[in-house]
Amino acid sequence: MNAASTHKAEARTIWLLSAYHTGSHAAWAGGYARHSRHNVQLLTLDGRFWKWRMQGGARALAAEAVARLDAPGAQPHDVLPAAILATDMVNLPAWLGLMRRRLPAATPVLLYMHENQLTYPWPAGERRDLTYAMINWQSMLAADAVAFNSAFHLESWFAEAPRLLKHFPDYNHLADVAAVRRRAFVLPAAIDTPSPASSRAIGAPDATSTPPLILWNQRWEYDKRPDRFFALLDRLDAAGTPFRL
């Protein structure tokens, strides 16, 4: 067997559940599907009404999954996923419950945390609804592994989770935090870097210049603090420090 056939034989079908499929979530999912050696199939919902996606999106995603399994001519060994990859906007326990009659019980499940509803900066004047943080938490309990997109994200979640769970009078899951932490890890979101010709330095004469490249790969929203980013750029510029952007 040659290397190409071995590589092909190892490929598996993965269902990627994306309940809020827009912006960075869609870019990440699409990039993974394009570059993975596996057959990554996207099951998605439009990126709007985020609260409703977390509350009711599991039903629509389950219906899409069942439609794939029941498609004319579909054979179970061809269409059943070898693994499930779900984003944080998916109510994972609800989806797994709805799919319990259709998926093998041992199907591995990975939860990918783009963000969470416990430490996510809340708009000024609005009160945080802990319902959605609990959906995140129970999804972590249901997953075999939990990936966070940064070390800061992971550490801030596990620093705050015990304070969330202490709100509840009994059976408060505090004993589960350590177990979930042990199966959590950091998996940064990949990016498509620009070509040298399209990433000419600000203040640099040509593509052979070597100032450091500063990359902003976040949404242009209040919670990402673009004001601080620009303040830093202003300081670098005022100091005469060369950089590329």
Indicate residue ranges for each PLM-predicted region:
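Conserved donor-binding/catalytic core segment of Leloir-type glycosyltransferases
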Residues: 191-192, 205-224, 230-237
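Nucleotide-sugar donor phosphate/pyrophosphate-binding loop at the beta->alpha transition
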Residues: 119-138, 162-172
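Short hydrophobic "strand-cap" motifs at the C-terminus of beta-strands
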Residues: 17, 149, 187, 214-218
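Short N-terminal targeting/anchoring amphipathic segment
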Residues: 12-15, 66-98, 105, 110-112, ...
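Charged active-site motifs of nucleotide-sugar-dependent glycosyltransferases
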Residues: 11-14, 209-214, 243-244
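N-terminal subdomain of nucleotide-sugar transferases
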Residues: 1-49, 53-72, 77-83
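Active-site proximal beta-strand in glycosyltransferases
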Residues: 102-121, 136-148
